[in-house]
Amino acid sequence: MTTALLTHPDCLKHVTPPGHPEQVARLERVLVALEPMDLLRTAAPLAVEDDLLRIHPQSHLDSLRAALPAAGYAGLDGDTFLSPGSLEAAYRGAGAAVKAVDMVISGAVQNAFCAIRPPGHHAESETPMGFCLLGNAALAAKHALDHHGLDRVAVVDFDVHHGNGTQELLYDEGRVLLIASQQMPLWPGSGGIDETGVFDTVVNMPLAPGSGGVAMRRAYEAQAFPRLEAFQPELIIISAGFDAHHADPLAGLNWSTDDFRWLTMRLCALAGGLCKGRVV
């Protein structure tokens, strides 16, 4: 089984203010950890605007470009910042998502991992927020559907915060099954079980603070995995956030490292039976 690793040094050009929780060092440490692994290392291309326009209007792209500072930082809100290299980093991240889908669907690799930043699952169609500028996971799903002609794609989003942006971008897309687990109550306040999408293809699994990995595993076994099997996706996209870890200070789901391993391996195993192992 071949796994592609898509990343680019430009993703390190998105610089946040001192003390910000989403910082360059996060990606640097991931890349160091991946160095000894046998992966097909692939440079993430810059996303082209025709691809980005599948999920964002031109006005969103223009407003990001207009807000770029010549030096220092530009605050878009209390959490979300731009530095001079932020847009280039974001376009590399989005390009990685598109390229990963291309590689997996073509059969060049079995699956792919995008080590990118800034993150994306809070970015709505016209609003950057929560550290996020572009909706990478939603873009990957739309690219698989509209460019490659797939009929059904699943997106699984695990994070301590709900992926409100991915949900907004895919809420009326009946060809995508979106499954999301998140701590509730917690910012951004969305992700309740009553948010099911226009075509009943959104599954939210809110988890209580401190509930830990046992509650997560029960939720996925009882709700997520049966829905995936019923939906029969041709590709599974994992939108992975690791702030549910017990060592992360921002919230309190208290997952262990093994919980993340278990969930990823279970999703890959399901993909083996459902969609030829195709996972991004």
What role is predicted for each listed range?
Residues 1-156, 161-280:
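HDAC/HDAC-like amidohydrolase catalytic core signature
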